[in-house]
Amino acid sequence: HLTMPLSRHTGQIPESTWTLGFREMTEPWKGAVGCLGVAVFFAMTIGIISWQALEQPPEEWVLRGRDAGMLWERGRGALLLRALPAGRPVLAIAVGSVPATEPPPPRDRCWHDGRQFCYSWEEDAELRLSLEPPAAPGTECYGVRWTPLRPDVTLKDCFSMANVSWYGGPSIRAQRWPLNGAQSPAQPLVSGDLSANPDGFGPLLERYFLGSTGVTVTVAPDVSLLLSLESHRQFCLETPAGRAEPLHYQLCVSADCPPRSPKHLTRDFPTCRSPIWRYHGPEGSAAKIKRGLRSLVRRLKRHRLQEGVVALGERGTAVLAAADLVPSGRRKRQAPELVEPLELSITLSPYAGVTSPLFLRSLRGGEAAGYWLSRQPRPGASSIPLLTTWKGQLCARLNVTSEAALGWYLARARRLRQVLGATYVAFEGVEGNSFLEQDVPVPAELEGDGYTEALAAALATLGNGTVISAGSRSSHLPLFVQMSPLRSDWSHAGLKGLIPSVLHYSLLGYNFFIPDAVGGSEAGATPGDPELFVRWLQIVTFLPVMAFGTPPWLCCDTWVLNLTRQCIQRHRDFVVPLLLKYSEEWQSLGYPIFRPAWWLSPMDPVAFTIEDEFLIGDEVLVAPITEKGQTWRDIYLPGQGHLWLDTNTARVFDGGTTLRNYSASLAEVPVFVK
């Protein structure tokens, strides 16, 4: 059986009353000491963490080249590009596809390759930076490639406008120079028709951006891309949502600020007589058109303006073509007689109305089913033309991926040119992606601006008397590009947008362009304003071609008519030789013919934002009035150390200075020669 253990005497002194009281008094002190210890522990931990954080710099080099390098900035999560050896800031890219709070990449997965840096945010995206072969002498280039690791990741990189002026990219409705002042929501970086979509991108577009710090950003044509412009903050490149596509582009940094590396070179350049007189007479029948053309030419002769080109629009061309295209050879060329001694320009487009004889005839042949863009057919089904809208009509659009379709279309254009006796053929509607506009899957060869690029290459085979309405990766072709219509007012959608457009086109390699008609061709706030007409005329005098929609005798007084004659003569005698001279330089060096003020003052921040002056080559500065009612303006003379002669007053001024309140009456345009 179990027995209870016997208690034993331990020899301890029994606790007295004062001992118990002392223990009760010391208990709170023990608790306080414990709390103090915990507090000290936490303080030490926080101190160690803070010390580590302070010891680590806010920026960490991730890839260095010879002349520049890339860093990762903690906190906001940004890639930085800096020039060496001084570390001059060149570019800041805010990264929107990975957590900004994540520390800088601690591990380089490409550590074995000194020309690359790789890091992966395991749940979001992978980044790969690489040193690339230089795009031009004196430059250093970096490839940036983001790859999404989940289907729902949208890659987005934003390029800061802080202390950087940006140029290039797309044309827009109210063109700005630089594009820092532009605003646009995120939308596909594809050319478009501004008349149909004023908030979209315009017909001239390159995936090329140039910064005043000496940096360029170039995106490959096969990258699906959206662009947003946030005025005076940043512009952003991002991939379409839900498609898990990579985002990659190239950064190049140059010692030149901004860089002046050549773009596209060509061995040939187009020719176009000036001025162009646009026909806006009756178009109801071939007989009415011919009478209208004769009447226009008679008036031009009467006013001693009998030179240049008479331009017939698409509708007038179609009416004449229907009357003059007869099966037999009985009908002789009659159209040249209509406009002699001027030349004739006709207008075509890659569209055909679904009820038009052209479209219906094209469907008769066996091959003709492939002449038009079509939706991808289901297995076993026949293709259906992708119908779109052009000038308010339901139309089909030429299939530029079909050699048979292009051959048929070009043969028709040549036949029309011959029968109508035209010297020039203008093509409208070259811009845009019809599949993208209708949210239809795009064939791989027509991604982005593939349509514009393919059609431009085909049209260039017609010769250098060809004009197209858009440009994308086609600046190397001997084609004239028709600028977008402008409003008849003084805004950036009107007169103030003309010089920014000139600089934009020329910078991207499109030096041979036809500006909108003098005074603007879209209704604006001041239609028929003689002052607007004159100030517009003074600018286009110095451009490749002078174009008129409203003849001067209809809009203005006799003195404006006389001024028009003087401007046409000045264009022929002074401007055309300059353009020929600098077109040779463009072909050999790739430098634009029309240059911004910063071209001669690349280190002066004042020059970066001047949008109402332009240079022809390095020797002529044009500084017109673009404000209503003004007869004076401030003029920046670029090029410190140069001397500029005012052609109106014969006064000489130093370059690198600003002339304040310089006088220019309505009959004058300030022009300086170096």
Short names for language-model regions:
Residues 305-568, 598-602:
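Aromatic- and carboxylate-enriched substrate-binding clefts and catalytic-loop regions
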Residues 43-53:
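Membrane-embedded alpha-helices of multi-pass membrane proteins, especially ion channels
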Residues 208, 300, 337-339, 409, ...:
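Conserved structural-core and active-site-/substrate-pathway-adjacent residues in large, well-folded domains
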Residues 26, 30-39, 43, 303-304, ...:
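Carbohydrate-binding surfaces of carbohydrate-active enzymes
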Residues 1-29:
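Short, low-complexity, Lys/Arg-enriched N-terminal segments of secretory-pathway carbohydrate enzymes
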Residues 194-197, 204-206, 296-301, 332-335, ...:
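Generic recognition of flexible, low-complexity loop/linker segments
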